[in-house]
A protein has these predicted regions:
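Active-site-adjacent loop/helix surface patches within enzyme catalytic domains
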Residues: 1-141
Length: 142
Protein backbone atom coordinates (compact mmCIF):
# COMPACT_ATOMS: atom_id res chain seq x y z
CA UNK A 1 0.00 0.00 0.00
CA UNK A 2 1.21 3.46 -0.91
CA UNK A 3 1.75 6.22 1.65
CA UNK A 4 -0.23 9.05 0.04
CA UNK A 5 0.57 12.62 0.96
CA UNK A 6 -2.67 14.32 2.04
CA UNK A 7 -4.26 17.28 0.28
CA UNK A 8 -2.94 19.48 3.08
CA UNK A 9 0.63 18.65 1.95
CA UNK A 10 0.07 20.72 -1.18
CA UNK A 11 -2.34 23.15 0.50
CA UNK A 12 -5.22 22.22 -1.77
CA UNK A 13 -8.34 24.31 -1.87
CA UNK A 14 -11.55 22.60 -0.86
CA UNK A 15 -13.43 20.95 -3.69
CA UNK A 16 -16.79 22.51 -4.52
CA UNK A 17 -18.32 19.11 -5.28
CA UNK A 18 -17.21 15.47 -5.14
CA UNK A 19 -18.89 12.37 -6.52
CA UNK A 20 -17.77 8.99 -5.24
CA UNK A 21 -16.89 6.21 -7.63
CA UNK A 22 -19.12 3.13 -7.64
CA UNK A 23 -16.84 0.13 -7.15
CA UNK A 24 -18.71 -2.09 -9.59
CA UNK A 25 -18.52 0.50 -12.41
CA UNK A 26 -14.75 1.16 -12.44
CA UNK A 27 -13.04 -0.70 -15.29
CA UNK A 28 -9.47 0.69 -15.24
CA UNK A 29 -7.38 3.82 -14.81
CA UNK A 30 -5.50 6.16 -17.12
CA UNK A 31 -2.16 7.87 -16.66
CA UNK A 32 -1.91 11.52 -17.68
CA UNK A 33 0.96 13.99 -17.77
CA UNK A 34 0.73 17.78 -17.59
CA UNK A 35 1.55 20.22 -20.32
CA UNK A 36 4.59 21.78 -18.66
CA UNK A 37 7.18 23.94 -20.38
CA UNK A 38 10.02 22.30 -18.43
CA UNK A 39 10.55 19.48 -15.91
CA UNK A 40 10.18 20.09 -12.17
CA UNK A 41 13.19 19.18 -10.03
CA UNK A 42 11.36 17.16 -7.35
CA UNK A 43 14.42 16.31 -5.22
CA UNK A 44 14.40 17.11 -1.51
CA UNK A 45 12.21 19.47 0.47
CA UNK A 46 12.61 22.25 -2.11
CA UNK A 47 11.53 19.83 -4.83
CA UNK A 48 8.54 18.75 -2.79
CA UNK A 49 7.57 22.42 -2.45
CA UNK A 50 7.92 22.91 -6.22
CA UNK A 51 5.64 19.96 -6.93
CA UNK A 52 3.10 21.24 -4.36
CA UNK A 53 3.15 24.65 -6.04
CA UNK A 54 2.57 23.06 -9.45
CA UNK A 55 -0.37 21.06 -8.08
CA UNK A 56 -1.92 24.26 -6.70
CA UNK A 57 -1.45 25.88 -10.10
CA UNK A 58 -3.16 23.01 -11.91
CA UNK A 59 -5.96 23.05 -9.38
CA UNK A 60 -6.44 26.80 -9.91
CA UNK A 61 -6.50 26.30 -13.67
CA UNK A 62 -9.06 23.52 -13.42
CA UNK A 63 -11.29 25.32 -10.90
CA UNK A 64 -10.92 28.96 -11.93
CA UNK A 65 -10.10 28.58 -15.61
CA UNK A 66 -12.29 25.60 -16.49
CA UNK A 67 -15.00 25.91 -13.83
CA UNK A 68 -14.47 22.39 -12.52
CA UNK A 69 -15.09 21.34 -8.91
CA UNK A 70 -11.44 20.48 -8.17
CA UNK A 71 -8.19 19.42 -9.80
CA UNK A 72 -9.15 16.79 -12.37
CA UNK A 73 -6.96 13.89 -11.21
CA UNK A 74 -7.29 11.54 -8.26
CA UNK A 75 -3.60 11.03 -7.50
CA UNK A 76 -0.30 12.54 -8.68
CA UNK A 77 3.11 10.85 -8.66
CA UNK A 78 6.34 12.83 -8.89
CA UNK A 79 9.82 11.77 -10.00
CA UNK A 80 10.86 11.13 -6.39
CA UNK A 81 8.10 8.54 -6.11
CA UNK A 82 5.87 10.60 -3.85
CA UNK A 83 2.15 9.92 -4.26
CA UNK A 84 -0.03 12.97 -3.70
CA UNK A 85 -3.74 12.78 -2.88
CA UNK A 86 -5.54 15.05 -5.33
CA UNK A 87 -9.26 14.20 -5.45
CA UNK A 88 -8.51 10.84 -3.87
CA UNK A 89 -8.83 7.35 -5.31
CA UNK A 90 -12.48 6.94 -4.31
CA UNK A 91 -13.62 10.26 -5.86
CA UNK A 92 -14.62 10.44 -9.52
CA UNK A 93 -12.02 12.00 -11.79
CA UNK A 94 -12.70 14.90 -14.12
CA UNK A 95 -9.75 14.15 -16.39
CA UNK A 96 -10.88 11.45 -18.78
CA UNK A 97 -13.27 13.31 -21.03
CA UNK A 98 -16.98 12.99 -20.38
CA UNK A 99 -18.92 11.92 -17.30
CA UNK A 100 -19.46 8.36 -18.54
CA UNK A 101 -15.75 7.74 -18.97
CA UNK A 102 -14.96 9.41 -15.64
CA UNK A 103 -17.34 7.00 -13.89
CA UNK A 104 -15.47 4.03 -15.37
CA UNK A 105 -11.81 5.11 -15.23
CA UNK A 106 -9.51 6.54 -12.61
CA UNK A 107 -6.95 9.22 -13.49
CA UNK A 108 -3.38 9.43 -12.20
CA UNK A 109 -1.15 12.42 -13.01
CA UNK A 110 2.53 11.66 -13.64
CA UNK A 111 4.43 14.88 -12.95
CA UNK A 112 6.66 14.77 -16.03
CA UNK A 113 8.07 17.54 -18.18
CA UNK A 114 8.82 17.54 -21.91
CA UNK A 115 11.22 14.76 -22.90
CA UNK A 116 11.38 13.49 -19.32
CA UNK A 117 11.10 9.75 -18.72
CA UNK A 118 9.62 8.25 -15.55
CA UNK A 119 12.26 7.57 -12.89
CA UNK A 120 12.56 4.17 -11.23
CA UNK A 121 10.94 5.70 -8.11
CA UNK A 122 8.01 7.06 -10.11
CA UNK A 123 7.55 3.72 -11.87
CA UNK A 124 7.61 1.76 -8.60
CA UNK A 125 5.05 4.08 -7.01
CA UNK A 126 2.87 3.96 -10.14
CA UNK A 127 2.80 0.17 -9.94
CA UNK A 128 1.87 0.35 -6.26
CA UNK A 129 -0.89 2.89 -6.98
CA UNK A 130 -2.28 0.56 -9.66
CA UNK A 131 -2.27 -2.23 -7.06
CA UNK A 132 -4.23 0.03 -4.69
CA UNK A 133 -6.79 0.72 -7.41
CA UNK A 134 -7.10 -3.01 -8.09
CA UNK A 135 -7.76 -3.70 -4.39
CA UNK A 136 -10.59 -1.16 -4.35
CA UNK A 137 -12.00 -1.75 -7.83
CA UNK A 138 -11.92 -5.46 -8.56
CA UNK A 139 -12.98 -5.16 -12.22
CA UNK A 140 -9.59 -3.62 -13.11
CA UNK A 141 -7.65 -6.31 -15.01
CA UNK A 142 -4.34 -7.67 -13.80
Amino acid sequence: MVDYLPRSAWRARAATNAASLVRSEVLNLAFHWPGMSKPINAVGDAGKARVASALRGWQAYHMDGRGWSDIAYQVAIDQEGRAWTLRGINIRSGANGDATVNRKYGAVLLVLGPGEKPSAKMTATAKAVVADYRKRFTRIPV
